[in-house]
């Protein structure tokens, strides 16, 4: 049986309070992924399973207590750890939804011209937006705002995304 691939769902940023809570930069839409067992990974170490004892939201961000982490000192040791879940535990999505990790490596085509812009190298996210980091065939990096008016279609079967870039955006990155 093939081992499941791990998918990054968050980053442990800092302790919160004195009782072992850890602030999480959380990349998923559903907090249910923070129930039960998750995996933590530091650097090149293998992911290790940890049990989520409790989770609550504070100022729009999850605060998590892991089993065996009972104070601020223990929580501090988790700073910078990546939180993962096995890919095969992710819920099924609706037909018009995708997981961000599924976008990595797909071709990006400019709708107006049909021109191949490049390949999505990675996805950067913050509290406000999702940015596709696209690598062109010439090796240039394009930061593309993955907002509804600009992303027209994503076809995972053909591994392509059709975009309508805002006026002038590509000139910033592609002009010599």
Curated annotation (Swiss-Prot):
Protein name, entry field: Ribosome maturation factor RimM
The keyword Transcription regulation is assigned to this record: no
Keyword Cytoplasm found: yes
Function: An accessory protein needed during the final step in the assembly of 30S ribosomal subunit, possibly for assembly of the head region. Essential for efficient processing of 16S rRNA. May be needed both before and after RbfA during the maturation of 16S rRNA. It has affinity for free ribosomal 30S subunits but not for 70S ribosomes.
An annotated GO BP: rRNA processing
Subcellular compartments: Cytoplasm
Species of the source: Nitratidesulfovibrio vulgaris (strain ATCC 29579 / DSM 644 / CCUG 34227 / NCIMB 8303 / VKM B-1760 / Hildenborough) (Desulfovibrio vulgaris)
MF terms (GO), sorted A to Z: ribosome binding
Keyword annotations: Chaperone, Cytoplasm, Ribosome biogenesis, rRNA processing
Pfam families membership: PRC_RimM (PF24986), RimM (PF01782)
Domain notes: The PRC barrel domain binds ribosomal protein uS19.
InterPro entries in the cross-refs: PRC_barrel-like_sf, PRC_RimM, RimM, RimM_N, RimM_N_sf, Transl_B-barrel_sf
Record's subunit section: Binds ribosomal protein uS19.
A cellular component term, taken from the record's GO annotations: cytoplasm
Domain PRC barrel: 95-169
NCBIfam families reported in the protein's UniProt record: 16S_RimM
Entry similarity comment: Belongs to the RimM family.
Organism superkingdom: Bacteria
